[in-house]
Curated annotation (Swiss-Prot):
The modification Phosphothreonine is found at residue 632. The modification Phosphoserine is found at residue 665. It catalyses: L-seryl-[protein] + ATP = O-phospho-L-seryl-[protein] + ADP + H(+); L-threonyl-[protein] + ATP = O-phospho-L-threonyl-[protein] + ADP + H(+). It comes from Schizosaccharomyces pombe (strain 972 / ATCC 24843). Residues 122-272 form the C2 domain. This is Serine/threonine-protein kinase sck1. ATP binds at residues 308-316, 331. Pfam families: C2 (PF00168), Pkinase (PF00069), Pkinase_C (PF00433). Its EC number is 2.7.11.1. Belongs to the protein kinase superfamily. AGC Ser/Thr protein kinase family. cAMP subfamily.
């Protein structure tokens, strides 16, 4: 990565930049050469004149440490002043605006807070490449997280780390390496030596302050690169303290400037999630955008690292993109299988919906980065959500506290709101299709059973979904069903999250159908508040016309007393701190996924093509291959994407009325955690058309 920074620096010429009044942004059209050196520490000056090479005597440390502290501070200010004068003279008389090799654009100093001067500048002769539609072509965003200062940490053992999020792709920045032998030597007083009022106690306290000052100003010097697939994207850098159980230290939202080889360098003030409160601390971030021509990717451009999931028609891999080393999830789908099962339309529909939701972004829906195909397979490349499936966490914890479940349900409501607003019915809401990112926010995935172009009161008839979450009208109504089926599934999900089992589960599928259509459910004792129970009853009303959400869709759900403490505006901007943060060590962490998959050896797996001899010997005909025309996702407008696809979105001709159902594999394992099915005898009854859902 450092080579890229240097390459961009050498490839462009700059003009002198006039520095404005102190602010928070420093941008250039050329790349200053960055050093991997950490900024000057206090101990760097211990060997200078006036410093003892033998450490110090703790008995006489108090006055000496104070004197040394003042000397160091004065020296830092002096060197910084000389450096600025030198750079100013160099830039004005000898330089063409390019920072000489081996120097710094700025070398931050410990114990000194200085906001760099601001300048926003780009050469007038810079050519900004555009595509044939007049839009800026896509490229790569290089990011360097330099350092922080004045972070709100209270312990010298603090381990500040960061999560950088861009277009839903997340990168973990580990805590900075601590040199155990570095810094001013620590003197540990003897147990029998008095501390109160002694010079030793005073020096120890001052030394602790210096150590804390060092910890509050971490130096990450971390570099990474992101694929840019849409303009106007923002980058979020969130800072946490691992030592204090992932305490949130603040975040910044940065809007990069997508001009070729444009450098943006700034100090950004950390902001709390609740803007009515204040936070200390700043971080220094640098970004460079690099334009690339339109590129068509294929499976050979990715390397499989782990298997993280497996389905009826293919597998999901953790992959690394070879040119940027960025980590993604790759869904590989066998063309032969979906043709044989008559699922071509559903599969292409999934891709279309991912394109639509990616271009009109929802923060709670997984983002599509690329899609492409070979003669035998289809490939969907999406953001990797390292927090794992919600199902995995529910399986391991049995059930969630109501507040945690409410947070997930609220974000799901916003995800469904986005889909319904765009006339999309989801139809497969279940824990396996809900992912968590590294911060603990949800992302809805797997749109294989979703249907687009379904207006508010329109109906559809396809019998599909996961058995335990099917709405009764899917089983009983010949006239079809509406988007209300998503709210029924949401009610089942709330019950399962809070109670620990599915309300309609039975070992026999036919019995499960009867339970959904006519069975009664009782809440367990001591679970769910009265508002929570009211919310579930409203969603599990068997009459879709009386169900919560039937009149005003998700607006009704958001106005329910169950969500009285939810600030929907802050939640939609991810400004509400999740109640649970997954344990994620790095970008390659798969510990939140099922080991049945992640322990699979992928070294011999060929993601480029099917290794099945049958597939190799009997290729698909040109007529069948033509059905997949337009699957590849490139940098085009959404209208062009759908025009290139040779079928209408609202067609469901492959498997109309054919049952595609799966039993929910989590039920037995969740019940095995020992959640007793004790019910509340005082729970009131809910009125429905098809029969009472809840038993008295």
């Amino acid at each position: 990565m450092t080579e890229i920074f240097g390459k961009l620096h050498r490839s462009s010429n700059s003009e002198n930049t006039n520095q404005a009044s102190p602010s928070t942004i420093q941008s250039h059209s050329t790349q200053p050469v960055l050093s991997n050196d950490h900024s000057t520490k206090v101990n760097d000056y211990e060997g200078k004149e006036g410093a003892s090479s033998n450490g110090y005597d703790p008995v006489f440390m108090s006055d000496r440490m104070k004197m040394r502290y003042n000397e160091i501070t004065a020296q830092l200010h002096k060197e910084q002043s000389l450096k600025e004068d030198k750079e100013s003279g160099s830039n004005s008389s000898e330089s063409n605006g390019i920072t000489p090799m081996g120097t710094y654009s700025e070398k931050p100093k410990l114990l000194q807070s200085r906001t760099p001067p601001s300048s926003c500048y780009i050469r007038h002769d810079t050519v900004v490449p555009k595509d044939k539609n007049g839009q800026h072509a896509f490229g790569r965003l290089y990011v360097r997280l330099h350092q922080g200062r004045d972070l709100n940490v209270k312990s010298v053992n603090a381990q500040p780390y960061a999560v950088i999020t861009f277009e839903k792709t997340q990168v973990m920045v580990p805590p900075p390496f601590k040199d155990i032998d570095g810094g001013i030597p620590i003197s540990i007083p003897s147990k029998n030596r008095p501390l109160a009022g002694s010079a030793s106690g005073s020096s120890s306290g001052l030394h602790s302050e210096l150590m804390l000052a060092d910890v509050r100003c971490p130096h990450w010097d971390f570099e990474t690169v992101f694929d840019v697939t849409k303009m106007k994207s923002q980058m979020v850098v969130s800072v946490y303290d691992k030592y204090e159980d992932d305490k949130f230290l603040g975040s910044v939202k940065i809007t990069p400037i997508f001009l070729h080889e444009y450098v943006q360098e700034a100090w950004y003030k950390l902001e709390p999630l609740d803007l009515t409160k204040s936070l200390e601390g700043e971080i220094k971030v640098e970004t460079i955008y690099e334009h690339i021509e339109h590129v068509r990717y294929g499976p050979e451009d990715f390397t499989a690292l782990r298997l993280i999931g497996k389905g009826t028609f293919g597998q999901v891999y953790l992959v690394r993109k070879n040119d940027t080393n960025r980590i993604y999830a790759m869904k590989k789908i066998s063309k032969k299988l979906i043709v044989r099962k008559k699922e071509v339309t559903h599969t292409l529909g999934e891709r279309n919906i991912l394109v639509r939701t990616s271009l009109d972004e929802s923060p709670f829906i997984v983002g599509l980065k690329f899609s492409f195909q070979t003669a035998s397979d289809l490939y969907l490349i999406t953001d990797y959500m390292s927090g794992g499936e919600l199902f995995w966490h529910l399986q391991h914890e049995g059930r969630f506290p109501e507040q945690r479940a409410k947070f997930y349900i609220a974000e799901l409501v916003l995800a469904l709101e986005h889909l319904h607003k765009h006339d999309i019915i989801y139809r497969d809401l279940k824990p396996e299709n809900i992912l968590l990112d590294a911060d603990g926010h949800i992302a809805l995935c797997d749109f294989g059973l979703s249907k687009a172009n379904l207006s508010a009161n329109a109906t559809t008839n396809t019998f599909c979904g996961t058995t335990e979450y099917l709405a009764p009208e899917v089983l009983l109504e010949d006239k079809g069903y509406t988007k209300q089926v998503d709210f029924w599934s949401l009610g089942v999900l709330v019950f399962e999250m809070c109670c620990g089992w599915s309300p309609f589960y039975a070992p026999d599928v036919q019995q499960m159908y009867r339970n959904i259509a006519f069975g009664k459910v009782r809440f367990p004792k001591g679970v769910l508040s009265s508002e929570g129970r009211s919310f579930v009853r409203g969603l599990l009303n068997r009459n879709p016309n009386h169900r919560l959400g039937a009149v005003a869709d998700t607006t009704e759900l958001k106005e329910h007393p169950f969500f009285a403490d939810i600030n929907w505006d802050l939640l939609s901007k991810k400004k509400v701190q999740p109640p649970f943060k997954p344990n994620v060590q790095n970008d390659l962490d798969v510990s939140n996924f099922d080991k049945e998959f992640t322990n699979t050896n992928v070294k011999n797996i060929n993601i480029v093509s099917n290794v099945d001899p049958a597939n190799a010997s009997t290729p698909l005909s040109n007529t069948i291959q033509d059905r997949f025309r337009g699957f590849t996702f490139v940098n085009k407008s959404i209208d062009e994407q759908f025009q290139n696809l040779g079928l209408q979105e609202n067609e469901e001709t492959d498997n109309l009325h054919a049952c595609r159902t799966t039993t929910h594999s989590s039920v037995n394992s969740i019940n095995s955690h020992g959640n007793p099915r004790t019910v509340d005898a005082n729970d009131p009854v809910a009125d429905t058309v098809f029969g009472e859902t809840f038993e008295a």
